[in-house]
Amino acid sequence: MGKAENYEMYSVELGPGPGGDMAAKMSKKKAGKGGGKKKEKLENMKKEMEINDHQLSVAELEQKYQTSATKGLSASLAADLLLRDGPNALRPPRGTPEYVKFARQLAGGLQCLMWVAAAICLIAFAIQASEGDLTTDDNLYLALALIAVVVVTGCFGYYQEFKSTNIIASFKNLVPQQATVIRDGDKFQINADQLVVGDLVEMKGGDRVPADIRILQAQGCKVDNSSLTGESEPQTRSPECTHESPLETRNIALFSTMCLEGTAQGLVVNTGDRTIIGRIASLASGVENEKTPIAIEIEHFVDIIAGLAILFGATFFVVAMCIGYTFLRAMVFFMAIVVAYVPEGLLATVTVCLSLTAKRLASKNCVVKNLEAVETLGSKSVICSDKTGTLTQNSMTVSNLWFDNHIHTADTTEDQSGQKFDQSSETWRALCRVLTLCNRAAFKSGQDAVPVPKRIVIGDASETALLKFSELTLGNAMGYRERFPKVCEIPFNSTNKFQLSIHTLEDPRDPRHVLVMKGAPERVLERCSSILIKGQELPLDEQWREAFQTAYLSLGGLGERVLGFCQLYLSEKDYPPGYAFDVEAMNFPTSGLCFAGLVSMIDPPRATVPDAVLKCRTAGIRVIMVTGDHPITAKAIAASVGIISEGSETVEDIAARLRVPVDQVNRKDARACVINGMQLKDMDPSELVEALRTHPEMVFARTSPQQKLVIVESCQRLGAIVAVTGDGVNDSPALKKADIGVAMGIAGSDAAKNAADMILLDDNFASIVTGVEQGRLIFDNLKKSIAYTLTKNIPELTPYLIYITVSVPLPLGCITILFIELCTDIFPSVSLAYEKAESDIMHLRPRNPKRDRLVNEPLAAYSYFQIGAIQSFAGFTDYFTAMAQEGWFPLLCVGLRPYWENHHLQDLQDSYGQEWTFGQRLYQQYTCYTVFFISIEMCQIADVLIRKTRRLSAFQQGFFRNRILVIAIVFQVCIGCFLCYCPGMPNIFNFMPIRYQWWLVPMPFGLLIFVYDEIRKLGVRCCPGSWWDQELYY
């Protein structure tokens, strides 16, 4: 994470372990919850690795690995080591069989509830069949329908999971196939997985590093660690040990990184899973996926539903036994009540709502791999964001210039309209010439029509930035170079820390040469004796050195990478045309040069990021930067994008302002805090948690993959729902551990993408804010959909309760309930997913996962016992009306059930003395089913209208803003008409044609529901915080 020339990953302890093994000491980290070998192994992997191979002399390395730095290992020893250590490959964890993955999709919270309901239906069917009381196959049909719903939604979920691949497979793609090895003094090619520790290997530009290598010889070798760290800045590799950390030092090349240029020879010090990338692979695959908040909410909801279903069922089982029913009959009643209480359509509703939101997010460059992650986006309270490519553009850009004793802001736009300095200045012309000529980068051919910022450049990041800036200011940088032919060049190296080239001048009448140099500012300045000011060479005295130092510190303090530039005209007398410049003999001057100026570069923030961070702050979401970059650069970028807000100070800032030592400052006075990897390594978990609690604005720099994982766990320990962004292989463990992992689609490695739950196709942090908004909206709308879905459970349940306790003919059948749950009500409940937000949801704080539940007590009470009760009254009113108009008055219906269901009784008399056969009574019962069905549907139209809002009036929200909902209501009514009046329905699905006036009976109840809810919302709006608000706002 983050762009940096150096990158710290693990700590170092002096002293090799016995037997050639790496030191086993680990920095102490707090163990996570739970026990077991797997958990202990994961905790050990989180700890920092300690090796010292980079600090040993060549002789000590030869002794440690029983090898030769010139001839390599013997073939026999190599064979023994391969047998002992195994192949140089990443060992994948035991894969999960596909059938197990599919089975998991069938065993979620709601799925289990529906499996139980299906089993109960089958048991009830079997009991009825055994008693010879099987007048209908409704229970069998209901069981089959429930199983079908679970299987179909399970297939959908499995398809979503199937699209993502195993994390370890992406690491395999990083492993090189071949390696050049020297054994017994002979050089040959072998498969990379046959390498062992102690092998002497060679690599060149274009090769992947075949293992963790200690460099013994190198010529201009540079490696690209982007596959490991996500960074694009090339890293120089040489035999010298330059730092105590193996990742800071230049004499270690890491497994799977790319050798960009030059050649190198070295000894293998780690292979396979013992390499750095091997440890990261093991760490990522060992991290278990956390339950998403929505999964936790659904489990909580299932617990409520199951508890209430069993409570109601047990209550009426006891009542049935007391009334005099047989045990088996009472058990059938118990099962019927439990099944009636299960919201069969809810699983499909939740799945479809999440899928619709995922589709909306995909249109906004956010691809969601896990449907449950959609809601998690809205729940998150902390974002641990990578810097490079996420907050920044992942492209080094010239930002500031210092010449003529002034710092100028560079304009990198196409039209150069913002360039404020005088481009006719002789000093500027000289500086521009140096940065153009002393540059090895080149544009890829055939890009003349491509805008300069988007052109592909062959070269490293810094030289690319300089070339593009030169192209924008001069107009044709490549053509400009051709006018100054290069006759000699010394490439940049870690020893000299400068790059030098000598050119002939463009004027054929001027036979002189010009020497141009760029490099580390202090190294360039020490080779200069004069400075160019307003086109004149002035002596580089103490005054100008102080001016240089002030400018250098000012630019460096901005977290920018600074380069110095100088030049020297070589006299014609000493260096005539055709002079043989020799870079080995250095037969030309490299001192007494003329300093031209400084140029600073930075990977600039994306233009949309500051606004996105501000929106996060407004929404109560904390943004933490976690990067591998230098602390100064990290702090500068954090301040520029708003992660560290204006006026916020770190402990160091306060100490500098008060001019006191840092240890005299109260850390709690600092709102912001920047912690580097070395400091983090020395902190125990409680100290890290305290730092996160104390400082609202946090930046972590120079962090390792293990440390990123620890940071995520610490945030979760504070009760936060954590999102992590990343693009490198090193990010994959934290991405998997987070509540939601967000990978970059353009710059992201395959490992990061596979570990993540969501992929940003445009690599833009602002897209995450879009995801937050959609996630919050879907949580609100899921609440509305669930409230709508649950309401009809009561009018579906009460017919069975009255049927058992009062013994009336059954008002509503199982098949009719299925049509309500899985047909007519699905469309309105899904249409609520399209509802617009009632207010600016991005001005609300993230929901508290322990307090703000998807299904809370007010929602259940209001849906079940208020709106649901009104719907039940509507259904029974229509039911008794239909029975009375056919001759069965309400009082006669009480206790009628045993006679009504007796298929041997063919002359049962109604209130008018008319005799009814069993077949006629059965058709009348189907008519009652249909009437009750229509009553529920008419009331549900009012219910879906009131569910459009939870606080605002429906008039404020607008009835027709959600066109999908209007279409769903029309479709619902059409289905109801079709089921009632389509020929053949009585024999197929037990629906009968009904009188038109029976459609009108429930309408007053629907109006009552609407008015009742408007009164509730008015009270909620007028009395915030009151008893009314607490009990009736869901």
Swiss-Prot record:
Presence of the UniProt keyword Hydrolase in the record: no
A GO MF term: magnesium ion binding
Gene Ontology terms: biological process: intracellular potassium ion homeostasis; intracellular sodium ion homeostasis; potassium ion import across plasma membrane; proton transmembrane transport; sodium ion export across plasma membrane
Transmembrane regions listed in the UniProt entry: 98-118, 142-162, 299-318, 331-348, 783-802, 813-833, 854-876, 929-948, 963-981, 997-1017
EC code(s) of this entry: 7.2.2.19
Binding site for Mg(2+): D386, T388, D727, D731
Membrane disposition: Multi-pass membrane protein
Function: The catalytic subunit of the gastric H(+)/K(+) ATPase pump which transports H(+) ions in exchange for K(+) ions across the apical membrane of parietal cells. Uses ATP as an energy source to pump H(+) ions to the gastric lumen while transporting K(+) ion from the lumen into the cell. Remarkably generates a million-fold proton gradient across the gastric parietal cell membrane, acidifying the gastric juice down to pH 1.
Classification lineage: Eukaryota, Metazoa, Chordata, Craniata, Vertebrata
Subunit structure: The gastric H(+)/K(+) ATPase pump is composed of the catalytic alpha subunit ATP4A and the regulatory beta subunit ATP4B. Interacts (via the P-domain) with ATP4B (via N-terminus); this interaction stabilizes the lumenal-open E2 conformation state and prevents the reverse reaction of the transport cycle.
Positions in the Lumenal compartment: 119-141, 319-330, 803-812, 877-928, 982-996
Gene designation: ATP4A
Modified residues (Phosphoserine): S27, S462, S600, S839, S953
Active site per database record: D386
Modification Phosphotyrosine occurs at: Y7, Y10
Subcellular location as annotated: Apical cell membrane
UniProt feature, compositional bias: Polar residues: 225-239
Name listed for the protein in its UniProt record: Potassium-transporting ATPase alpha chain 1
Principal location class: membrane
Species in which this protein is naturally found: Canis lupus familiaris
